[in-house]
Design a protein with these regions (language model features):
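Loop/turn elements at helix/coil->beta-strand transitions in domains of secreted/extracellular proteins
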Residues: 82, 92-96, 152-154, 227-228, ...
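Conserved catalytic neighborhood of penicillin-recognizing serine enzymes
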Residues: 152-229, 251, 293-323
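Surface-exposed intrinsically disordered loops and tails
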Residues: 5-16, 34-39, 43, 91, ...
Length: 430
């Protein structure tokens, strides 16, 4: 007897452009103890239990997300190993609406294949992802939020003229002995630069954030408390891909996103959704409900939300960030035609190896990332990306275009009502 033996693909590899979302759902279920007391029991329930899982994915949004990341750099011609990913969540619920990246789902055997990977670039390592990617200036809204919480206004004047702070300068840090932290990581003090030349001026806090000027950021930081920033970052779930806090008090570079590990797009989108929903954080979830083979509902997944910011503070951050994508902002070319109903922040790490645009409307919060997972800190500057070679790449370049493409298509299908104007106190000049 001659047998015609062939292998049959199974599982998430059959899910097409939803393959990585499928893998995320499986890993999410593997951590759900309602499916079994042990990982082995949960795995059996998932694979052999005949369960039907109803997810939160919006097929139209997923198609738009996949088109956006593939337009940045198609997998088939990705000779330079440039990665792109995008995740969108619904503020106020945590529903994951879309999740895409510019690779096919692979296995460890595909480690040298530029078109495939086993890693989901959108999620943390616990869900099949990575340790994250340095957030760059997308961390700055947390500093802004703490600035507003401390009673300072968005239009208050900031000294943005300094690129150096001596070791003798005591940063406010109430969780340290004596209430001060003295930076000794460099013998002469803490130094840094702005992404572009200039910007060493006095101006408003809003101006400094909208232009993404590091000199303004540290001018603001010198007036507030590092320990408060750290606590707020944890409260807002600013965690790296291993689940640890992104922010580190001794490492002043983490305040501009120079973190040890990085953040995932899903975590970043969920964090920015706090501003979109006027201060409410909702844990991201990919599932609506699970039904049994007979159609009986086994479990309905509920929103898990908590108020982590005062609504006026969140609205103040939105008031500032909407200026980023308005004329005069650092990503003004990346607006989506909703000048009072959309907001965003770009992020670029030191050598442009990781770039971001994260932004939102009331109805969607979307994180867009372009960088490199396999090549570490390899810069995108001067690298061929889908036929283009640019001398300088920042968050607005490719990640911003990705974000804009997706949001222009999908955001109008959700809530695009204008943001609430913050109080006079938030907009004050002192």
């Amino acid at each position: 007897i001659k047998l015609n033996v062939h292998t049959k693909s199974q599982g998430c590899s059959l899910a097409g452009d939803k393959a990585f979302f499928c893998r995320y759902v499986v890993n999410y279920l593997l951590q759900d103890e309602s499916l079994g007391a042990t990982a082995e029991l949960r795995n059996t329930a998932i694979k052999r239990g005949g369960l039907k899982v109803i997810t939160t994915l919006n097929p139209e949004a997923q198609t738009a997300a996949k088109q956006a990341v593939d337009s940045t750099q198609p997998a088939a011609t990705n000779w330079n190993d440039v990665n792109s990913a995008l995740t969108s969540v619904e503020p106020g619920t945590g529903r994951v609406i879309a999740m895409a990246q510019n690779t096919e789902l692979g296995s460890p055997a595909d480690a040298n294949d530029h078109s495939k990977t086993e890693y989901n670039y959108n999620v943390d390592s616990a869900y099949g992802g990575t340790r994250g990617f340095q957030p760059g200036s997308t961390f700055k809204p947390i500093i802004l939020a703490q600035w507003l919480i401390s009673g300072r206004g968005a239009n208050a004047t900031v000294n943005g003229t300094q690129l150096f702070w001596p070791t003798s300068f005591g940063w406010n840090a109430k969780c340290y002995d004596g209430g001060k932290y003295y930076y000794t990581g460099q013998p002469n003090g803490w130094s840094y630069k702005n992404a572009v030349n200039g910007g060493l001026t006095y101006g408003t806090a809003a101006y400094g954030i909208r232009q993404s000027l590091n000199s303004y950021l540290y001018g603001m930081l010198s007036q507030i408390d590092l320990c408060d920033v750290h606590d707020l970052s944890i409260k807002m779930h600013a965690l790296d891909g291993t689940g640890e806090p992104l922010h580190s008090i001794p490492d002043l570079g983490t305040n501009i996103g120079g973190t040890k590990y990085g953040i995932s797009p899903l975590t970043s989108a969920s964090m920015y959704a706090i501003f979109a929903s006027e201060g409410k954080y909702c844990s991201p979830r990919p599932i609506e409900k699970i039904t049994k083979t007979n159609g009986e509902t086994m479990k309905e997944y509920q929103n898990q939300c908590e108020q982590v910011l005062d609504p006026d503070i969140a609205n103040g951050v939105s008031w500032v960030l909407k200026g980023v994508i308005q004329p005069g902002g650092s990503a003004s070319q990346r607006g989506i035609g909703l000048p009072n109903g959309s907001a965003a922040k770009t992020g670029t790490n030191d050598n442009s190896s990781q770039t971001w645009q994260v932004g939102y409307t009331r109805g969607l919060s979307t994180a867009s990332w372009v960088g490199s997972n396999n090549l570490g800190f390899r810069s995108l500057n001067g690298v061929g990306i889908n036929g283009r070679v640019l001398e300088y790449v920042d968050g607005a370049t490719y990640a911003g275009a990705q974000w804009q493409s997706f949001m222009k298509t999908i955001a109008p299908k959700y809530n695009t009502k204008d943001f609430t104007t913050p109080s006079d106190k938030i907009l004050s000049y002192s």
